[in-house]
Amino acid sequence: MREIVLNAVELAIDEAVVVDAAGREQRAVVTLDEAAERARLDFAETLATGRGRLRIAFRGTLNDKLRGFYRSVYKDPSGATRTLAATQFEATDARRAFPCWDEPAFKAVFAVTLAIDPVLTAVSNTRVVAETREGDRKVLRFADTITMSTYLVAFVVGELEHTQPTPVGATPVSVWCVPGKRRLAAFGQEVAVASLRYFEDYYGLPYPGDKLDLLAIPDFAAGAMENLGAITFRETALLVDEKAASHAELQRVADVVAHENAHMWFGDLVTMSWWNGIWLNEAFATFMEMLAVDDWKPEWQRWVAFGVSRAAALSVDGLHSTRPIEFPVRAPREADAMFDVLTYEKGASVLRMLEQYLGAELFREGVRDYLRTHAFGNADTGDLWAALGRASRQPIPAVMDNWIFAPGYPLVSVAVEGGQLVVRQQRFTYLPEPLRWYGAAAPASPPAPARWQVPVQLRITAGGRGTVDRLLLAEDETRRPLPAGFESVVVNEGGHGFYRVRYDGDLRMRLLGRLPRLAAIERFNLVNDAWAVTAAGLMPVTDYLDLTTRFREERDKNVWSALLGSLAALNRLVRPADRPGLEALGRDRAAPTLATLGWTPRPGEDELTRQLRGDLVRALGTLGNDPEVQARAAELYAAHERGAEVDPNVLPALIAVVAHAGDEARYEIFLQRFRTAATPQEEQRYLYALTAFRQPSLVEHTLARTINGEIRTQDAPFVVRSMLLLVHSRGQAWEFVKKQWDTMDRLYPKHGLRRMAEGVIGLATPEWEADVHRFFQERKIDLGGKTLEQYLEQLRVAVALRERESAALSTYLASP
């Protein structure tokens, strides 16, 4: 062998030398291929067989792209600008920090040594085992890591402070942050400790590292990153003032911290062999975060709220342009595109469905077997199925392969025919045919299976008693005799199935008459599935709006998220002349529940009810454009400014409503609040409030701030996305995107740019749709994987609904 090839990009390699077992050195001629992200080392003579050492001297730049080894800039408590250096390597960016074999299967032990300014602090995956001085540098040597993949290596250097470590067994758990923010670390540390204990018990294996540090980074592209022993986070996902935060803000911190801790086993200890299997990491971590948080805070009802996440995956997976959970990956851009709702939420939903089908204990036994068998190595989906099969004695591949390796999911239809309950399955799609677009010649998804093996739970009520009937729907149709005194049937009892349900008219009306007897997740699914079949053209929109009248007294915040989400979607579809009618409909649906709850919490009220109050205030003041709610919100916000106590679940809603009705003077006040926010959550509240101001000049001001450095590049793409989805700003935002695309492409993290482009689904008119296609075609923009095709198909679904239902909507909304 006279050639070595490894990954390197944006690096200058000054020297590459191989030292063989006899101490003989051979220098290489180095050729860098930036396009392939590889370095080729050519040697004059054949390298000796046996062990050797490759020594590489290289240089790089601390970039500002939030990937590889990059710089994060922030202001300290005195207002001075400071810089820290951090890493983000997943999926394929370790090669931007050091030459390496940057693929998940090339696991290795990493020995990190950092030479830094003596006044700074450094954190890496393991504990510091030696500290020395070399000239004007402090040299920190860290313990060897476990055998792990390159994307999990991490180091952070800067002015940092940390909490007092809390031991979990022999593992010290600490939170690190920039100076002045340690007061916000207690809640995140509490979650980290609780979830680490839970996972050690659930997995039956000790935590694989020698310490666990959680680090809040001011600039961070993703939500967090599961580097073994040195988990990095956005500040909003780790630092929080528990007393000042809303339930939603606390829940986000708990979910993200638990998710990353779950990865210490699923992902770090056992790693997928290649990026097509990334779901084994992310779906399991998403599933496990729910288990851990639900165990820690059962009153939060996380599995009910998970219905919202499941619905997001169902929305994308109902497209012809969806992909299987496990999908071929050939290039770094394709690997990056795998980090989506299909990998995370669909994957977690399918795991939850399988867990409920097998039983929690058998499922856990299989998980433990999988982790023990493949510890410190790599695995694939077949390895997981084998472990679960050994535990359950079930033919797991036969049941599960179509859920993982084929796109889409079934629509389970249920009807009464001839004294029998008839249950049918077919693939659910929003459009009857795939979207015709300029990239349609690209390879299509694998064909969906004719049928799935669907674990269906039916709750049949007859004679005042409910019984649960479990069936594995493997054929197109199955029939069950109706019991005497039949009253109703709930399909997907418990809400854990990854499929949609379509009831015939009579069965749907029977359920609507029994809403108080349905579980919250069942009511959520009833609304969400009804809206989906409406969007697919299988139910008139007027029937759906009639259905929403039955929920005026609904008290579950997740059900309301489905109701309000559908009204927000309609708001983007209706003709301008019909919008006042839709606003009135929104007020009619939401006002009764807010009137029942009142504007202030009552003694003993649970957190979910408090969050619902805030959600309804926001919806009525913005989507409903209710002048009375806007006036009351302004009064309460003014009282807050004078020092009055306002419930943290209501305050974000007040800020949003005041902005929606606000003028230029109020905009300047909120801009200053954004700049001087005391917590990451407060900063986010005022940042997104800037998008709610409706005057065209203020819309332009906010858009300009997304590219002039005032809004961090980690946040700016999401601000633009929000403005593309808002009716008052979408036109200006779209013109801005077209004009500034090159600037955004240069400034924003690639992940952020992909998410920003999702906002085009808000441009729901035929004219805008044509312009969107024209823009992306002319610019030859590729967002990786099927991302762009999915956005365009979602836009087509919205425009098709508008074209199909506009006349009926106009008549319905005009009626008293």
PLM regions: where:
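A surface-exposed beta-strand-loop module
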Residues: E10-D76, P99-D102, E134-D136, E477-G485
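Hydrophobic alpha-helical and helix-loop surface patches within well-folded domains
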Residues: I13, R24, L84, F142, ...
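Long, ordered, helix-rich scaffold segments
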Residues: R310-A312, E417, V422-R424, R459-L471, ...
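Surface-exposed beta-strand/loop patches in extracellular or lumenal glycoproteins
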Residues: M1-E10, A111-D117, T429-Q457
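Short edge-strand/loop segments of extracellular domains
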Residues: A8-A12, S72-T83, D219-A222
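Aromatic/His-enriched, Gly/Pro-containing loop or helix-boundary segments
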Residues: E3, E25-L47, A86-Q88, T92-R95, ...
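Conserved short loop/turn motifs at secondary-structure junctions
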Residues: N7, T271, R368-A375, W385-R390, ...
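Extended, low-hydrophobicity, Ser/Thr/Pro/Gly-biased non-transmembrane segments
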Residues: A39, R55-T163, V168, L184-F187, ...
